[in-house]
């Protein structure tokens, strides 16, 4: 009987003690949140850097494409272009002993003959007797012959049938542009001195000037 009482008291005493609750444990989510935040921040920064680099690369690519020609030259075209750049351009050239001025070549004779003789001589050279184009050309030719005392024949003569001065190409003289001094007879031809255009006999002897167009010659090197 006593033993049972003692056991009951002990049991009550133990069961009457307050229970100590274990400290609350942190959930796994609570511990991992800061790490996820850091990871997300790193990933965001990495993505931003990649985006910036992609934009820069795309800009460089677009700029490169804009600078390229739409049609690329073939190797044959490139070689042809190189050949053209190494060749000398075509230039205008007068024959030896001829003088160039604007688009003409002029040859001054060293002897004196009649007007018809000078006409024939120029024809033999593949040229024509001088046809004065304008006053500027006339000044050039006078300067070219200023050391020669004789006047020079030009391709202008008086035709009795028309009673007009005509050039050898058939055109009529414009008297406002060129004034002829001297008597006009049935056999009159025009010559030029340093200060006048003279009417004189076609059988007189004068030097003469032939003219021809400048000849275009290519100076490309053959290889």
Curated annotation (Swiss-Prot):
All copies of domain C-type lectin, residue ranges: 101-211
Cytoplasmic side: 1-45
Keyword field contains Endoplasmic reticulum: no
GO MF entries: carbohydrate binding; identical protein binding; protein homodimerization activity; signaling receptor activity
GO cellular component terms given for this protein: cell surface; external side of plasma membrane; plasma membrane
Residue numbers on the Extracellular membrane side: 67-223
Role, per record: Receptor for CLEC2D/OCIL. Ligand-binding contributes to inhibition of cytotoxic natural killer (NK) cells. May mediate MHC class I-independent 'missing-self' recognition of allografts, tumor cells and virus-infected cells.
Domain remark in the UniProt entry: Contains 1 copy of a cytoplasmic motif that is referred to as the immunoreceptor tyrosine-based inhibitor motif (ITIM). The phosphorylated ITIM motif can bind the SH2 domain of several SH2-containing phosphatases leading to down-regulation of cell activation.
Name listed for the protein in its UniProt record: Killer cell lectin-like receptor subfamily B member 1B allele A
Species this protein is from: Rattus norvegicus (Rat)
Recorded name of the encoding gene: Klrb1b
